[in-house]
Swiss-Prot record:
Compartment(s) where it occurs, according to its Swiss-Prot or TrEMBL record: Cytoplasm
Family annotation (SUPFAM superfamilies): N-terminal nucleophile aminohydrolases (Ntn hydrolases), SIS domain
Subunit structure: Homodimer.
Span of domain Glutamine amidotransferase type-2: 2-219
Designated name of the protein: Glutamine--fructose-6-phosphate aminotransferase [isomerizing]
Lineage: Archaea, Methanobacteriati, Methanobacteriota, Thermococci, Thermococcales
Reaction it catalyzes: D-fructose 6-phosphate + L-glutamine = D-glucosamine 6-phosphate + L-glutamate
Keywords: Aminotransferase, Cytoplasm, Glutamine amidotransferase, Repeat, Transferase
Name of the gene: glmS
Stretches assigned to coiled coil: none
Amino acid sequence: MCGIIGYIGDRKACEVIVKGLKRLEYRGYDSAGVVTGNGETLDVRKGAGRIDKLTEKLGFLEMEGNRGIGHTRWATHGVPNDINAHPQKDCTGKIVLVHNGIIENFAELKEELLKKGHVFRSDTDTEVIAHLIEEELKGSENFEEALRKALNKLRGSFALAIVYADEPDKLYVVRNESPLVLGIGEGEMFAASDVPAFLEYTNKVIFLDDGEYAILTKDSYVVKRIDTGEVVEKPVHEISWTLEMAEKAGYPHFMLKEIYEQPRAIKDAIHGNREIIRSVAEEIANYDKIIFVAMGTSYHAALVGKSLFQRLAKKVPIVEEASEFRYEFEDLIDDKTLVIAITQSGETADTLAAMKLAKKNGAKVLAVVNVVGSMATRIADLTLYTHAGPEIGVAATKTYTTQLTVLTMLAIELAKVLGTASEDYLEKLEDELMKVPELVELALKHDEALRELAETLKDKRDFFYIGRGISVPTALEGALKLKEISYIHAEGLSAGELKHGPLALLEDGVPVVAINPSGKVFDKMVSNIEEAKARGAMIISLSDREELSRVSDVLVKMPEVDELLSPIVYVVPLQLLAYHLAVLRGNDPDKPRNLAKSVTVE
Protein backbone atom coordinates (compact mmCIF):
# COMPACT_ATOMS: atom_id res chain seq x y z
CA MET A 1 0.00 0.00 0.00
CA CYS A 2 1.09 3.60 -0.60
CA GLY A 3 3.84 4.65 -2.98
CA ILE A 4 7.16 6.47 -2.67
CA ILE A 5 9.27 8.11 -5.38
CA GLY A 6 12.49 10.03 -4.76
CA TYR A 7 14.82 11.78 -7.20
CA ILE A 8 18.13 13.63 -7.18
CA GLY A 9 19.92 14.74 -10.35
CA ASP A 10 19.78 17.48 -12.97
CA ARG A 11 16.19 17.07 -14.16
CA LYS A 12 13.29 19.08 -12.83
CA ALA A 13 12.43 16.88 -9.87
CA CYS A 14 8.70 17.63 -9.83
CA GLU A 15 8.24 16.20 -13.33
CA VAL A 16 10.01 12.95 -12.46
CA ILE A 17 8.04 12.68 -9.22
CA VAL A 18 4.58 13.30 -10.67
CA LYS A 19 5.23 10.76 -13.45
CA GLY A 20 6.46 8.29 -10.85
CA LEU A 21 3.42 8.79 -8.63
CA LYS A 22 1.12 8.19 -11.58
CA ARG A 23 2.86 4.88 -12.21
CA LEU A 24 2.37 3.93 -8.56
CA GLU A 25 -1.36 4.66 -8.53
CA TYR A 26 -2.13 0.94 -8.79
CA ARG A 27 -0.91 0.54 -5.19
CA GLY A 28 -3.97 2.41 -3.95
CA TYR A 29 -4.10 5.81 -2.22
CA ASP A 30 -6.38 8.49 -0.81
CA SER A 31 -3.99 11.46 -0.77
CA ALA A 32 -0.69 12.55 -2.28
CA GLY A 33 2.10 15.07 -1.87
CA VAL A 34 5.44 16.32 -3.15
CA VAL A 35 8.43 18.17 -1.68
CA THR A 36 11.22 19.71 -3.78
CA GLY A 37 14.07 22.14 -3.24
CA ASN A 38 17.83 22.40 -3.65
CA GLY A 39 18.67 24.88 -0.92
CA GLU A 40 17.46 25.73 2.55
CA THR A 41 13.88 26.30 1.40
CA LEU A 42 11.80 23.18 0.90
CA ASP A 43 8.52 23.50 -0.99
CA VAL A 44 5.90 21.08 0.40
CA ARG A 45 2.55 20.65 -1.37
CA LYS A 46 0.04 17.92 -0.49
CA GLY A 47 -3.64 17.10 -0.17
CA ALA A 48 -6.38 14.49 -0.21
CA GLY A 49 -7.54 13.36 -3.64
CA ARG A 50 -6.29 12.00 -6.94
CA ILE A 51 -2.91 12.96 -8.38
CA ASP A 52 -4.26 14.60 -11.53
CA LYS A 53 -6.57 16.90 -9.59
CA LEU A 54 -3.92 17.71 -6.98
CA THR A 55 -1.37 18.48 -9.71
CA GLU A 56 -3.76 21.03 -11.18
CA LYS A 57 -4.95 22.40 -7.82
CA LEU A 58 -1.58 22.60 -6.04
CA GLY A 59 0.72 23.16 -9.00
CA PHE A 60 2.96 20.14 -8.51
CA LEU A 61 4.57 20.73 -11.92
CA GLU A 62 5.48 24.31 -11.04
CA MET A 63 7.73 23.28 -8.15
CA GLU A 64 11.43 24.16 -8.47
CA GLY A 65 14.48 22.08 -7.67
CA ASN A 66 16.43 19.03 -8.81
CA ARG A 67 15.88 17.00 -5.64
CA GLY A 68 12.57 15.86 -4.27
CA ILE A 69 10.30 13.13 -2.98
CA GLY A 70 6.67 12.24 -3.60
CA HIS A 71 4.12 10.03 -1.91
CA THR A 72 0.72 8.46 -2.34
CA ARG A 73 -0.87 7.67 1.03
CA TRP A 74 -3.30 5.00 2.11
CA ALA A 75 -4.57 6.03 5.54
CA THR A 76 -3.61 3.82 8.51
CA HIS A 77 -3.17 6.44 11.25
CA GLY A 78 -5.25 9.58 10.84
CA VAL A 79 -8.13 10.13 8.43
CA PRO A 80 -7.37 10.96 4.79
CA ASN A 81 -7.19 14.76 4.62
CA ASP A 82 -4.78 17.52 3.60
CA ILE A 83 -3.04 17.67 6.99
CA ASN A 84 -2.45 13.93 7.26
CA ALA A 85 -1.19 13.62 3.68
CA HIS A 86 2.56 13.15 3.24
CA PRO A 87 5.18 14.65 3.23
CA GLN A 88 5.35 15.33 6.97
CA LYS A 89 7.93 17.59 8.63
CA ASP A 90 9.52 18.46 11.97
CA CYS A 91 9.12 21.67 14.00
CA THR A 92 11.80 23.51 12.02
CA GLY A 93 10.49 22.49 8.61
CA LYS A 94 13.99 21.41 7.62
CA ILE A 95 13.37 17.65 7.92
CA VAL A 96 10.72 16.49 5.47
CA LEU A 97 9.88 12.86 4.81
CA VAL A 98 7.41 10.36 3.42
CA HIS A 99 6.67 6.94 4.88
CA ASN A 100 5.06 3.64 3.95
CA GLY A 101 4.25 1.22 6.76
CA ILE A 102 3.13 1.35 10.36
CA ILE A 103 5.12 2.57 13.38
CA GLU A 104 3.91 0.34 16.20
CA ASN A 105 5.35 2.42 19.05
CA PHE A 106 4.42 5.84 17.64
CA ALA A 107 2.08 6.67 20.55
CA GLU A 108 4.76 6.33 23.23
CA LEU A 109 7.33 8.16 21.08
CA LYS A 110 4.87 10.97 20.45
CA GLU A 111 4.14 11.31 24.15
CA GLU A 112 7.87 11.65 24.90
CA LEU A 113 8.32 14.23 22.15
CA LEU A 114 5.33 16.27 23.31
CA LYS A 115 6.90 16.46 26.76
CA LYS A 116 10.04 17.87 25.14
CA GLY A 117 8.06 20.65 23.48
CA HIS A 118 7.47 19.30 19.99
CA VAL A 119 4.33 20.54 18.26
CA PHE A 120 2.47 18.10 16.01
CA ARG A 121 0.26 19.15 13.12
CA SER A 122 -1.16 15.79 12.01
CA ASP A 123 -2.56 12.57 13.46
CA THR A 124 -0.09 10.39 11.56
CA ASP A 125 2.53 8.04 12.91
CA THR A 126 4.80 9.39 10.15
CA GLU A 127 5.16 12.85 11.65
CA VAL A 128 6.63 11.26 14.77
CA ILE A 129 9.64 10.11 12.73
CA ALA A 130 10.46 13.65 11.56
CA HIS A 131 10.28 15.03 15.10
CA LEU A 132 12.31 12.11 16.46
CA ILE A 133 15.12 12.82 13.98
CA GLU A 134 14.94 16.51 14.93
CA GLU A 135 15.29 15.59 18.60
CA GLU A 136 18.21 13.23 17.97
CA LEU A 137 19.95 15.89 15.89
CA LYS A 138 20.43 17.98 19.02
CA GLY A 139 22.94 15.49 20.40
CA SER A 140 24.48 14.22 17.17
CA GLU A 141 27.48 15.27 15.11
CA ASN A 142 25.58 15.14 11.82
CA PHE A 143 22.25 14.30 10.23
CA GLU A 144 23.16 10.71 9.35
CA GLU A 145 24.00 9.94 12.99
CA ALA A 146 20.70 11.47 14.13
CA LEU A 147 18.82 9.47 11.52
CA ARG A 148 20.36 6.18 12.65
CA LYS A 149 19.61 6.93 16.30
CA ALA A 150 15.99 7.67 15.44
CA LEU A 151 15.57 4.61 13.24
CA ASN A 152 16.87 2.34 15.98
CA LYS A 153 14.07 3.59 18.25
CA LEU A 154 11.30 2.71 15.79
CA ARG A 155 9.30 -0.51 15.99
CA GLY A 156 7.26 -1.61 13.03
CA SER A 157 7.44 -1.45 9.25
CA PHE A 158 8.76 1.53 7.38
CA ALA A 159 10.06 2.62 4.01
CA LEU A 160 11.21 6.24 4.14
CA ALA A 161 12.46 8.92 1.80
CA ILE A 162 13.89 11.99 3.54
CA VAL A 163 15.23 15.39 2.51
CA TYR A 164 17.13 17.65 4.91
CA ALA A 165 17.29 21.34 4.02
CA ASP A 166 20.86 21.77 5.30
CA GLU A 167 22.13 18.98 3.01
CA PRO A 168 20.77 20.00 -0.41
CA ASP A 169 22.92 17.52 -2.31
CA LYS A 170 21.64 14.38 -0.53
CA LEU A 171 18.58 12.18 -0.44
CA TYR A 172 18.13 9.60 2.34
CA VAL A 173 16.04 6.44 1.96
CA VAL A 174 15.31 3.61 4.38
CA ARG A 175 13.81 0.13 4.21
CA ASN A 176 12.47 -2.04 7.02
CA GLU A 177 9.69 -4.52 6.21
CA SER A 178 8.27 -2.26 3.50
CA PRO A 179 9.54 -2.34 -0.10
CA LEU A 180 12.01 0.17 -1.51
CA VAL A 181 14.24 -0.09 -4.58
CA LEU A 182 16.98 2.21 -5.86
CA GLY A 183 17.37 3.23 -9.50
CA ILE A 184 20.93 3.91 -10.66
CA GLY A 185 21.17 6.45 -13.48
CA GLU A 186 23.90 8.49 -15.16
CA GLY A 187 24.30 11.60 -13.01
CA GLU A 188 20.99 10.91 -11.26
CA MET A 189 19.55 8.56 -8.66
CA PHE A 190 16.05 7.33 -7.95
CA ALA A 191 14.25 5.51 -5.15
CA ALA A 192 10.75 4.08 -5.27
CA SER A 193 8.35 1.53 -3.89
CA ASP A 194 8.32 -0.25 -7.24
CA VAL A 195 10.42 -0.23 -10.40
CA PRO A 196 7.85 1.21 -12.88
CA ALA A 197 8.04 4.55 -11.05
CA PHE A 198 11.47 5.26 -12.60
CA LEU A 199 11.85 2.66 -15.36
CA GLU A 200 11.57 5.39 -18.01
CA TYR A 201 14.99 6.63 -16.90
CA THR A 202 16.97 3.53 -15.88
CA ASN A 203 16.67 -0.25 -15.70
CA LYS A 204 19.59 -0.63 -13.26
CA VAL A 205 18.28 -1.26 -9.76
CA ILE A 206 19.38 -2.15 -6.25
CA PHE A 207 16.92 -3.89 -3.93
CA LEU A 208 17.36 -2.75 -0.35
CA ASP A 209 16.97 -5.37 2.36
CA ASP A 210 15.27 -4.92 5.71
CA GLY A 211 17.32 -2.90 8.17
CA GLU A 212 19.18 -0.90 5.51
CA TYR A 213 19.35 2.76 4.54
CA ALA A 214 20.97 4.54 1.61
CA ILE A 215 22.44 7.99 1.07
CA LEU A 216 22.04 9.20 -2.50
CA THR A 217 23.71 12.06 -4.33
CA LYS A 218 23.25 12.61 -8.03
CA ASP A 219 26.53 10.80 -8.76
CA SER A 220 26.81 8.23 -5.98
CA TYR A 221 25.10 5.98 -3.49
CA VAL A 222 26.08 4.15 -0.34
CA VAL A 223 24.02 1.52 1.49
CA LYS A 224 24.47 0.92 5.22
CA ARG A 225 23.03 -1.13 8.07
CA ILE A 226 20.65 0.75 10.38
CA ASP A 227 21.87 -1.05 13.49
CA THR A 228 25.65 -0.77 12.98
CA GLY A 229 26.16 1.85 10.28
CA GLU A 230 28.38 -0.58 8.38
CA VAL A 231 28.55 -0.24 4.60
CA VAL A 232 26.78 -3.01 2.67
CA GLU A 233 27.90 -4.00 -0.82
CA LYS A 234 24.81 -4.49 -2.99
CA PRO A 235 24.51 -6.11 -6.43
CA VAL A 236 23.06 -4.04 -9.26
CA HIS A 237 20.29 -5.84 -11.17
CA GLU A 238 19.14 -5.06 -14.70
CA ILE A 239 15.37 -5.16 -15.19
CA SER A 240 14.52 -7.08 -18.37
CA TRP A 241 11.00 -5.74 -18.95
CA THR A 242 10.40 -2.32 -20.44
CA LEU A 243 8.21 0.63 -19.59
CA GLU A 244 6.12 -0.15 -22.66
CA MET A 245 5.28 -3.51 -21.09
CA ALA A 246 3.81 -1.62 -18.15
CA GLU A 247 1.71 0.72 -20.31
CA LYS A 248 -1.84 0.08 -21.54
CA ALA A 249 -0.86 -0.49 -25.19
CA GLY A 250 -4.22 0.71 -26.51
CA TYR A 251 -6.43 -1.18 -24.05
CA PRO A 252 -8.93 0.88 -22.04
CA HIS A 253 -7.65 -0.59 -18.77
CA PHE A 254 -4.56 -2.40 -17.52
CA MET A 255 -6.74 -5.26 -16.30
CA LEU A 256 -8.07 -6.05 -19.78
CA LYS A 257 -4.57 -5.77 -21.25
CA GLU A 258 -3.24 -8.17 -18.62
CA ILE A 259 -6.09 -10.64 -19.21
CA TYR A 260 -5.13 -10.70 -22.90
CA GLU A 261 -1.43 -11.06 -22.07
CA GLN A 262 -2.03 -14.43 -20.41
CA PRO A 263 -1.18 -16.69 -23.36
CA ARG A 264 2.23 -15.01 -23.66
CA ALA A 265 2.74 -14.92 -19.88
CA ILE A 266 1.97 -18.64 -19.53
CA LYS A 267 4.49 -19.43 -22.29
CA ASP A 268 7.09 -17.34 -20.47
CA ALA A 269 6.34 -19.14 -17.20
CA ILE A 270 6.86 -22.51 -18.87
CA HIS A 271 10.05 -21.56 -20.71
CA GLY A 272 11.44 -19.64 -17.74
CA ASN A 273 11.26 -22.66 -15.42
CA ARG A 274 12.16 -25.57 -17.68
CA GLU A 275 15.80 -25.65 -16.64
CA ILE A 276 15.30 -25.23 -12.89
CA ILE A 277 12.12 -27.16 -12.14
CA ARG A 278 13.81 -30.57 -11.92
CA SER A 279 16.39 -29.49 -9.35
CA VAL A 280 13.72 -27.82 -7.20
CA ALA A 281 11.54 -30.94 -7.34
CA GLU A 282 14.48 -33.13 -6.29
CA GLU A 283 15.30 -30.82 -3.38
CA ILE A 284 11.76 -30.90 -1.94
CA ALA A 285 10.85 -34.51 -2.79
CA ASN A 286 11.56 -35.95 0.66
CA TYR A 287 9.39 -33.51 2.59
CA ASP A 288 6.07 -34.92 3.75
CA LYS A 289 5.04 -32.02 5.98
CA ILE A 290 4.20 -29.40 3.35
CA ILE A 291 2.42 -26.13 4.06
CA PHE A 292 1.34 -23.62 1.42
CA VAL A 293 1.06 -20.03 2.72
CA ALA A 294 -0.44 -17.15 0.75
CA MET A 295 -3.08 -14.43 0.76
CA GLY A 296 -5.86 -13.37 -1.62
CA THR A 297 -5.61 -14.68 -5.16
CA SER A 298 -2.30 -16.36 -4.32
CA TYR A 299 -4.17 -18.34 -1.66
CA HIS A 300 -6.47 -19.69 -4.37
CA ALA A 301 -3.39 -20.68 -6.38
CA ALA A 302 -2.16 -22.51 -3.28
CA LEU A 303 -5.44 -24.45 -3.11
CA VAL A 304 -4.93 -25.57 -6.70
CA GLY A 305 -1.33 -26.47 -5.83
CA LYS A 306 -2.62 -28.63 -2.98
CA SER A 307 -4.88 -30.58 -5.36
CA LEU A 308 -2.05 -31.03 -7.85
CA PHE A 309 0.34 -32.29 -5.18
CA GLN A 310 -2.30 -34.73 -3.92
CA ARG A 311 -3.36 -36.04 -7.31
CA LEU A 312 0.08 -36.28 -8.91
CA ALA A 313 2.75 -36.51 -6.19
CA LYS A 314 0.56 -38.25 -3.57
CA LYS A 315 1.56 -35.63 -1.02
CA VAL A 316 -1.04 -34.22 1.39
CA PRO A 317 -0.19 -30.55 1.95
CA ILE A 318 -1.90 -28.03 4.21
CA VAL A 319 -2.96 -24.64 2.86
CA GLU A 320 -3.03 -21.76 5.34
CA GLU A 321 -3.64 -18.05 5.01
CA ALA A 322 -0.32 -16.41 5.77
CA SER A 323 -1.98 -14.01 8.21
CA GLU A 324 -3.07 -16.96 10.38
CA PHE A 325 -0.02 -19.16 9.90
CA ARG A 326 2.08 -17.53 12.63
CA TYR A 327 -0.58 -18.03 15.26
CA GLU A 328 -1.63 -21.57 14.34
CA PHE A 329 1.64 -23.21 13.31
CA GLU A 330 4.40 -21.57 15.34
CA ASP A 331 5.06 -24.71 17.42
CA LEU A 332 4.53 -27.14 14.56
CA ILE A 333 7.28 -26.00 12.18
CA ASP A 334 10.66 -27.74 12.21
CA ASP A 335 13.46 -28.81 9.89
CA LYS A 336 11.23 -31.54 8.45
CA THR A 337 8.77 -28.93 7.14
CA LEU A 338 8.55 -27.47 3.65
CA VAL A 339 6.78 -24.12 3.40
CA ILE A 340 5.74 -23.00 -0.08
CA ALA A 341 5.03 -19.27 -0.04
CA ILE A 342 3.14 -17.78 -2.98
CA THR A 343 3.20 -14.00 -3.47
CA GLN A 344 2.95 -11.98 -6.67
CA SER A 345 4.86 -8.98 -5.38
CA GLY A 346 7.22 -10.82 -3.08
CA GLU A 347 6.46 -8.07 -0.56
CA THR A 348 3.12 -9.16 0.98
CA ALA A 349 3.64 -8.43 4.67
CA ASP A 350 1.75 -11.43 6.08
CA THR A 351 3.46 -13.84 3.71
CA LEU A 352 6.91 -12.46 4.50
CA ALA A 353 6.19 -12.80 8.23
CA ALA A 354 5.15 -16.43 7.70
CA MET A 355 8.33 -17.12 5.72
CA LYS A 356 10.50 -15.58 8.42
CA LEU A 357 8.85 -17.71 11.10
CA ALA A 358 9.34 -20.82 9.00
CA LYS A 359 13.03 -20.03 8.49
CA LYS A 360 13.49 -19.29 12.18
CA ASN A 361 12.13 -22.74 13.03
CA GLY A 362 14.41 -24.48 10.54
CA ALA A 363 11.93 -25.16 7.72
CA LYS A 364 12.87 -25.23 4.06
CA VAL A 365 11.15 -22.32 2.27
CA LEU A 366 10.25 -22.26 -1.42
CA ALA A 367 8.89 -18.99 -2.85
CA VAL A 368 6.72 -18.72 -5.95
CA VAL A 369 7.12 -15.06 -6.92
CA ASN A 370 6.69 -12.70 -9.86
CA VAL A 371 8.95 -9.79 -8.90
CA VAL A 372 12.66 -10.52 -9.30
CA GLY A 373 14.80 -9.50 -6.33
CA SER A 374 11.83 -8.93 -4.02
CA MET A 375 12.11 -9.62 -0.31
CA ALA A 376 10.48 -13.05 -0.56
CA THR A 377 13.24 -14.20 -2.90
CA ARG A 378 15.86 -13.11 -0.40
CA ILE A 379 14.23 -14.92 2.51
CA ALA A 380 13.53 -18.15 0.62
CA ASP A 381 15.92 -21.07 0.20
CA LEU A 382 14.50 -21.73 -3.26
CA THR A 383 12.61 -19.53 -5.71
CA LEU A 384 10.48 -20.20 -8.75
CA TYR A 385 9.62 -17.10 -10.77
CA THR A 386 6.30 -16.83 -12.57
CA HIS A 387 7.71 -14.55 -15.31
CA ALA A 388 4.37 -12.76 -15.75
CA GLY A 389 5.96 -9.35 -16.21
CA PRO A 390 4.58 -6.21 -14.58
CA GLU A 391 0.96 -6.40 -13.48
CA ILE A 392 -0.47 -2.94 -12.84
CA GLY A 393 -4.17 -3.68 -12.34
CA VAL A 394 -4.98 -4.27 -8.68
CA ALA A 395 -6.99 -7.42 -9.48
CA ALA A 396 -4.58 -10.28 -10.20
CA THR A 397 -5.07 -11.96 -13.59
CA LYS A 398 -1.93 -13.07 -15.43
CA THR A 399 0.00 -13.46 -12.20
CA TYR A 400 -2.63 -16.00 -11.07
CA THR A 401 -2.55 -18.13 -14.20
CA THR A 402 1.26 -18.09 -14.23
CA GLN A 403 1.30 -19.15 -10.57
CA LEU A 404 -0.94 -22.08 -11.54
CA THR A 405 1.37 -22.89 -14.45
CA VAL A 406 4.46 -23.01 -12.25
CA LEU A 407 2.71 -25.09 -9.58
CA THR A 408 1.53 -27.53 -12.27
CA MET A 409 5.07 -27.89 -13.59
CA LEU A 410 6.36 -28.48 -10.08
CA ALA A 411 3.72 -31.12 -9.28
CA ILE A 412 4.43 -32.96 -12.54
CA GLU A 413 8.17 -32.94 -11.91
CA LEU A 414 7.68 -34.02 -8.30
CA ALA A 415 5.58 -36.95 -9.49
CA LYS A 416 8.37 -37.92 -11.89
CA VAL A 417 10.98 -37.83 -9.14
CA LEU A 418 8.80 -39.85 -6.76
CA GLY A 419 7.34 -42.21 -9.37
CA THR A 420 3.82 -41.57 -8.11
CA ALA A 421 2.09 -41.30 -11.50
CA SER A 422 2.50 -43.14 -14.78
CA GLU A 423 5.19 -41.77 -17.06
CA ASP A 424 2.80 -41.87 -20.02
CA TYR A 425 0.21 -39.75 -18.22
CA LEU A 426 2.80 -37.23 -17.00
CA GLU A 427 4.22 -36.91 -20.51
CA LYS A 428 0.69 -36.39 -21.88
CA LEU A 429 0.00 -33.77 -19.21
CA GLU A 430 3.24 -31.93 -20.05
CA ASP A 431 2.35 -31.93 -23.74
CA GLU A 432 -1.10 -30.55 -22.95
CA LEU A 433 0.37 -27.88 -20.67
CA MET A 434 2.41 -26.65 -23.64
CA LYS A 435 -0.90 -26.17 -25.49
CA VAL A 436 -2.60 -24.27 -22.66
CA PRO A 437 -1.67 -20.83 -24.10
CA GLU A 438 -3.67 -21.77 -27.23
CA LEU A 439 -6.60 -22.90 -25.07
CA VAL A 440 -6.52 -19.58 -23.21
CA GLU A 441 -6.65 -17.84 -26.60
CA LEU A 442 -9.83 -19.81 -27.33
CA ALA A 443 -11.30 -18.84 -23.96
CA LEU A 444 -10.62 -15.17 -24.74
CA LYS A 445 -12.87 -15.44 -27.80
CA HIS A 446 -15.85 -15.36 -25.41
CA ASP A 447 -15.05 -11.74 -24.57
CA GLU A 448 -17.86 -10.08 -26.53
CA ALA A 449 -20.44 -12.69 -25.49
CA LEU A 450 -19.45 -12.17 -21.87
CA ARG A 451 -19.78 -8.40 -22.25
CA GLU A 452 -23.32 -8.92 -23.56
CA LEU A 453 -24.05 -11.29 -20.69
CA ALA A 454 -22.75 -8.68 -18.25
CA GLU A 455 -25.32 -6.21 -19.62
CA THR A 456 -28.07 -8.52 -18.35
CA LEU A 457 -26.38 -9.07 -14.98
CA LYS A 458 -25.13 -5.62 -14.00
CA ASP A 459 -28.00 -4.91 -11.59
CA LYS A 460 -27.84 -8.25 -9.76
CA ARG A 461 -27.06 -7.97 -6.05
CA ASP A 462 -25.66 -11.45 -5.37
CA PHE A 463 -23.69 -14.08 -7.27
CA PHE A 464 -22.71 -17.63 -6.32
CA TYR A 465 -19.78 -19.48 -7.89
CA ILE A 466 -19.63 -23.25 -7.47
CA GLY A 467 -17.22 -26.02 -8.37
CA ARG A 468 -16.00 -29.37 -7.12
CA GLY A 469 -12.56 -30.87 -6.67
CA ILE A 470 -9.84 -28.84 -8.33
CA SER A 471 -12.49 -26.38 -9.60
CA VAL A 472 -13.39 -25.13 -6.11
CA PRO A 473 -10.46 -22.64 -6.08
CA THR A 474 -11.64 -21.39 -9.49
CA ALA A 475 -15.05 -20.70 -7.97
CA LEU A 476 -13.39 -18.83 -5.11
CA GLU A 477 -11.24 -16.82 -7.50
CA GLY A 478 -14.18 -15.97 -9.76
CA ALA A 479 -16.13 -14.67 -6.77
CA LEU A 480 -13.16 -12.66 -5.53
CA LYS A 481 -12.63 -11.04 -8.93
CA LEU A 482 -16.29 -10.04 -9.13
CA LYS A 483 -16.58 -8.50 -5.70
CA GLU A 484 -13.25 -6.69 -5.68
CA ILE A 485 -13.85 -4.72 -8.88
CA SER A 486 -17.64 -4.67 -9.46
CA TYR A 487 -18.58 -4.29 -5.76
CA ILE A 488 -21.28 -6.96 -6.15
CA HIS A 489 -21.55 -9.46 -3.31
CA ALA A 490 -20.27 -12.83 -4.49
CA GLU A 491 -19.66 -16.12 -2.73
CA GLY A 492 -17.48 -18.95 -3.99
CA LEU A 493 -17.94 -22.43 -2.57
CA SER A 494 -17.85 -26.14 -3.13
CA ALA A 495 -21.04 -27.22 -4.89
CA GLY A 496 -21.45 -29.91 -2.25
CA GLU A 497 -21.84 -27.16 0.35
CA LEU A 498 -24.92 -25.68 -1.34
CA LYS A 499 -27.39 -27.84 0.55
CA HIS A 500 -25.64 -27.09 3.86
CA GLY A 501 -26.87 -23.50 4.05
CA PRO A 502 -26.29 -21.37 0.94
CA LEU A 503 -29.23 -23.00 -0.88
CA ALA A 504 -31.50 -20.95 1.41
CA LEU A 505 -30.26 -17.79 -0.32
CA LEU A 506 -31.17 -18.91 -3.83
CA GLU A 507 -34.30 -17.47 -5.41
CA ASP A 508 -35.58 -16.52 -8.82
CA GLY A 509 -32.93 -14.94 -10.99
CA VAL A 510 -29.94 -15.22 -8.62
CA PRO A 511 -26.91 -16.00 -10.83
CA VAL A 512 -25.06 -19.22 -10.06
CA VAL A 513 -21.83 -19.62 -12.03
CA ALA A 514 -20.94 -23.31 -12.29
CA ILE A 515 -17.41 -24.43 -13.19
CA ASN A 516 -17.75 -27.96 -14.56
CA PRO A 517 -15.02 -29.35 -16.83
CA SER A 518 -15.04 -33.00 -17.82
CA GLY A 519 -13.65 -35.11 -15.02
CA LYS A 520 -14.47 -37.41 -12.17
CA VAL A 521 -16.90 -34.98 -10.48
CA PHE A 522 -18.78 -33.88 -13.61
CA ASP A 523 -21.96 -35.86 -12.88
CA LYS A 524 -21.99 -34.78 -9.24
CA MET A 525 -21.79 -31.17 -10.37
CA VAL A 526 -24.75 -31.66 -12.71
CA SER A 527 -26.82 -32.81 -9.73
CA ASN A 528 -25.79 -29.71 -7.75
CA ILE A 529 -26.63 -27.46 -10.69
CA GLU A 530 -30.07 -29.06 -10.95
CA GLU A 531 -30.64 -28.34 -7.24
CA ALA A 532 -29.86 -24.67 -7.78
CA LYS A 533 -31.96 -24.56 -10.96
CA ALA A 534 -34.95 -25.99 -9.09
CA ARG A 535 -34.79 -22.97 -6.72
CA GLY A 536 -35.08 -20.54 -9.62
CA ALA A 537 -31.39 -19.66 -9.92
CA MET A 538 -30.00 -18.39 -13.21
CA ILE A 539 -27.37 -20.97 -14.17
CA ILE A 540 -24.26 -19.83 -16.04
CA SER A 541 -22.15 -22.90 -16.77
CA LEU A 542 -18.56 -23.15 -17.95
CA SER A 543 -17.94 -26.56 -19.48
CA ASP A 544 -16.57 -28.44 -22.47
CA ARG A 545 -19.69 -30.65 -22.44
CA GLU A 546 -22.57 -29.51 -24.65
CA GLU A 547 -25.14 -31.54 -22.68
CA LEU A 548 -24.82 -29.07 -19.82
CA SER A 549 -26.95 -26.66 -21.83
CA ARG A 550 -29.93 -28.75 -20.72
CA VAL A 551 -29.66 -27.42 -17.16
CA SER A 552 -28.09 -24.04 -17.93
CA ASP A 553 -29.52 -20.66 -18.87
CA VAL A 554 -26.14 -19.77 -20.39
CA LEU A 555 -23.40 -22.18 -21.42
CA VAL A 556 -19.91 -20.79 -21.97
CA LYS A 557 -18.45 -23.54 -24.15
CA MET A 558 -14.89 -24.21 -23.08
CA PRO A 559 -12.15 -26.07 -24.98
CA GLU A 560 -11.37 -29.63 -23.93
CA VAL A 561 -8.56 -29.75 -21.40
CA ASP A 562 -7.30 -32.19 -18.79
CA GLU A 563 -9.13 -31.62 -15.52
CA LEU A 564 -5.85 -30.84 -13.72
CA LEU A 565 -5.09 -28.04 -16.19
CA SER A 566 -8.62 -26.66 -16.25
CA PRO A 567 -8.08 -24.03 -13.50
CA ILE A 568 -5.69 -22.13 -15.80
CA VAL A 569 -8.17 -22.01 -18.67
CA TYR A 570 -11.50 -21.77 -16.85
CA VAL A 571 -10.62 -18.71 -14.78
CA VAL A 572 -10.22 -16.55 -17.91
CA PRO A 573 -13.96 -16.10 -18.71
CA LEU A 574 -14.54 -15.32 -15.03
CA GLN A 575 -11.93 -12.55 -15.21
CA LEU A 576 -13.62 -11.13 -18.30
CA LEU A 577 -17.09 -11.29 -16.76
CA ALA A 578 -15.90 -9.46 -13.66
CA TYR A 579 -14.13 -6.87 -15.80
CA HIS A 580 -17.18 -6.10 -17.94
CA LEU A 581 -19.50 -5.92 -14.93
CA ALA A 582 -17.14 -3.45 -13.26
CA VAL A 583 -16.97 -1.22 -16.33
CA LEU A 584 -20.74 -1.35 -16.94
CA ARG A 585 -21.33 -0.32 -13.34
CA GLY A 586 -19.07 2.70 -13.80
CA ASN A 587 -16.12 1.40 -11.78
CA ASP A 588 -12.42 1.67 -12.60
CA PRO A 589 -11.29 -1.99 -12.58
CA ASP A 590 -7.64 -0.97 -12.28
CA LYS A 591 -8.18 0.93 -9.03
CA PRO A 592 -10.94 -0.66 -6.94
CA ARG A 593 -11.94 1.24 -3.85
CA ASN A 594 -10.31 0.40 -0.52
CA LEU A 595 -7.85 -2.04 -2.12
CA ALA A 596 -4.16 -1.97 -2.99
CA LYS A 597 -2.05 -4.09 -5.33
CA SER A 598 0.60 -5.01 -2.80
CA VAL A 599 -0.48 -5.28 0.84
CA THR A 600 2.73 -4.36 2.61
CA VAL A 601 1.26 -3.86 6.09
CA GLU A 602 -0.20 -6.64 8.23
